[in-house]
Amino acid sequence: MKDLNPEMGKFATTKGPPQDNRGMVDIATLPNFPANRSGTPREEMYLAPNKMETPRILNMNMVPDYLQKENFSPDFSSATVSAKSSPVNVTHDESLPLGTIESNSTKDSKYAVQRQQQQVVDFIENNMQLLSSETLNFRSDIMKTLELPIPKRRDIKGNHLSKLLFAKSPLTINTYCQFYDRRTKRICNQEMIWKDKNSREKHGSRKYQRHLSKVHDVQLTPNNFTEFFDHNSPLFQECYDYQSRLMRDLLVEPDAKFKEKKKKKKGDVNGNHPETGSSLINHQVQQQNVRELQSKIAMNDLIEILIDLNIPFSVLDYQPMRNWLIKYSIISTDTLPDEVYFKTDPGVNELEHNSSNLNNSNSGTPHNHNQNQHTN
């Protein structure tokens, strides 16, 4: 191999084994790479690379094999130049395309996002059972505390009937549809989510009516809205108690109700009963006579029972027995009926006389006083 030495002015020939020149690459042979640069190597270190001079490797076949790496862009950081070319050290930033750097950073960020998403998926899968159980427990607590809104007259007369089919809970601001499907025997219980209470009160009627129309295909009226409840549910029975006067007062016309109150007030002023129209004094006397008659009938029944069981009438003088009679209105005073009361019914006298004779014969000792007592 011959080398030209400009200082010696002659050719020098070196002998020996062939040297490995793979590390020595003429940078001018690279595609689209500028061979000539102005300035000294020290100045070029501070010069920004021109975009037009950035090497663009379109085909990897143009790059020598020893510079190629699998799945990576070629690295020119170790390349050197020969003596004929300018002694420029090619850095990694100068040789590596900008698009490759951006693509690598984009891939890294994409992989980071994918790793985060996978972590979230793994966490959800591992804790799905716990989350689902907590959600179910919270929903069951809500269902236990549901309350139907108490109807008001403006709800019956206005366009707010749909609000009456949605129950509320103190645990959340959301509401739950209580429409009862008679075919499936199930309550809807669909949750209506609200941002706050103001939006619920402001837009509740329209949203509820839209749900009832689209999902259940029903139109509510003051006469049929109670038909869409489950009448056997405690929730309905607590709010719509027909034994109370809730629904009856709501459905009665205000004018008719006012007339009834006025009529009742007028009857009280005149001293007449509002229903019968009779005098209140006569009505009280009639009630007293009815109570006395009921007491007399009950006392006769009690006497017949005592005679059938051979129980002496002296048991009626027993104070607990007397209290029991007063409690159940069999007698109205502390004094029991006298003998005249028993003598008024001859059947009672005869039964009592037979009962006394039976008691005397069983005891073996005559009671002349009792026999004389029942002898006329």
Swiss-Prot record:
What Pfam families does UniProt report for this protein, alphabetically? RSF
Q: Which InterPro entries match?
A: Rsf1_fungi
Region Disordered: list its residue ranges: 1-23, 88-107, 258-279, 347-376
Alphabetized, the UniProt keywords read:
Activator, Cytoplasm, Mitochondrion, Nucleus, Transcription, Transcription regulation
- Where in the cell is the protein located? Cytoplasm; Nucleus; Mitochondrion
The entry's function note states: Mitochondrial and nuclear transcriptional activator required for respiratory growth.
Query: What name does this protein carry?
Result: Respiration factor 1
Please spell out the taxonomic lineage of the organism that makes this protein: Eukaryota, Fungi, Dikarya, Ascomycota, Saccharomycotina
